[in-house]
A protein has these predicted regions:
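Basic, Lys/Arg-rich alpha-helical nucleic-acid-recognition elements, primarily the DNA-binding modules
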Residues: 1-87
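ATP/nucleoside-binding phosphotransfer catalytic cores, i.e., glycine-rich phosphate-binding loops
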Residues: 9-17, 32, 52, 76-77, ...
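HTH-adjacent hinge/linker in prokaryotic transcriptional regulators
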Residues: 60-142, 159, 165-166, 184
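Ligand-binding beta-strand-loop-alpha-helix segment within the catalytic cores
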Residues: 99-109, 168-245
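Short Gly/Thr/Asp-enriched flexible loops that form oxyanion-binding sites at enzyme active sites
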Residues: 153-165, 251-259
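Gly/Ser/Thr-rich active-site loops/lids in small-molecule metabolic enzymes
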Residues: 253-282
Length: 348
């Protein structure tokens, strides 16, 4: 296939350019549907006149429907869109970028989706879909315990989970941390419940605050139900989690001004599992959290990290210096370009 594409690029470059353009239009309609022509033209940076001709072609081929509510992708269009993904990624250089990024970060695998989630919110949805596929490939055992962390990216991950995900497997989704006091929709408990409801699988909850003082932590740890919940979470054979911007996460946790001043002074850029990292990957602050700890990752065979957007590049870089080598990163072009163009040497 790659040889054929190389030949086509030399003999029929115009044909490939048209195919790429129509793929981008189809892709944009799929993620924004139902979408009007004016909105779509703005998203693609294309004039309405040029776009009109292209969408009429796609409609004539039965790939999209056009209604008063906007344009949507048909079942046939979705098949074509999925079939073209690999080819388009090769043409755009994404496969090469994925390999270089995995080597740079010294992790198992990187998957890069087109776009920048900072600019185009639905790129996050595509990252979620790719993460779901990677989790599906990882869960080869008959029985699996999957830990899921909280956050808006994980909420999107849950939304992209198909109803038939279990496929005969016994799956138990567990929250990687407590969550009382956090935005309900983005709590790990809520996300696990949503996934289990969609897929007809089981889930457990951790109804404790994510952050605890030492005395409260030790008191709760004496409770048998709490001990059992933590043992279950720590038995996970797969985990899906995000990476946060340091200051954003600190403010979301209602962190004191004193601690915010500290992590700012120590140049923290990324956060995961309550650990705050600077650009060199050094831990500059740690919050006592209830649930999985960073060191627990060493015992988990399958680790999928979902984080994207140009603004997250520094956070991703800082975290990956300490990430286990079996980590799979799902990101977007915005973050990938910043990481590849801004780095001259290995990160670890």
């Amino acid at each position: 296939m790659s040889d054929l594409i190389n030949i086509q690029q030399k003999l029929l470059p115009d044909v490939l350019a048209v195919m790429q353009k129509r793929y981008q239009i189809l892709r944009s309609i799929y993620f924004a549907e139902p979408v009007g022509r004016r909105t779509l033209a703005g998203m693609l940076g294309m004039s309405e006149r040029v776009l009109r001709g292209e969408v009429e072609f796609l409609k004539a081929q039965g790939l999209i429907d056009i209604a008063s509510s906007g344009m949507t992708v048909t079942k046939e269009g979705l098949i074509v869109f999925r079939d073209l993904e690999g080819i388009m990624n090769q043409l755009s250089g994404l496969h090469s970028a994925e390999n270089r990024l995995a080597e740079l970060l010294q992790i198992k695998k990187c998957l890069v989706v087109q776009g920048d989630s900072d600019i185009t919110p639905w790129v996050r949805e595509e990252m979620g879909r790719v993460a779901v596929k990677q989790l599906d490939l990882a869960l080869v055992e008959k029985r699996n315990v999957v830990a899921v962390m909280g956050g808006s990216t994980m909420a999107t991950f849950a939304d992209t989970m198909p109803s038939d995900f279990a496929k005969g497997r016994e799956l138990l989704f567990v929250p990687g941390r407590g969550g009382i006091g956090e935005d309900l929709d983005n709590q790990a408990n809520t996300i696990c419940d949503r996934i289990a409801t969609k897929t007809g699988t089981k889930h457990r909850v951790l109804y404790v605050p994510e952050q605890l003082g030492e005395e409260a932590y030790q008191s709760l740890m004496k409770e048998p139900a709490i001990q059992e919940g933590l043992r279950l979470v720590q038995s996970a054979n797969a985990i899906v989690h995000g990476i946060g911007d340091a200051l954003t996460m600190a403010k979301r946790r209602h962190t004191s001004d004193e601690v915010i001043e500290k992590i700012t002074r120590l140049s923290a850029v990324g956060e995961a599992f309550g650990y705050y990292f600077n650009e060199q990957g050094e831990v500059v602050h740690k919050v006592s959290t209830f649930g999985l700890q960073f060191e627990d990752l060493a015992k988990i065979p399958h680790i999928i990290v979902v984080a994207g957007g140009t603004s997250k590049a520094k956070a991703i870089k800082s975290y990956m210096k300490s990430a286990p080598e079996n980590t799979i990163l799902v990101t977007d072009e915005g973050a990938a370009n910043m990481l590849l163009n801004g780095s001259k040497a290995h990160l670890k």
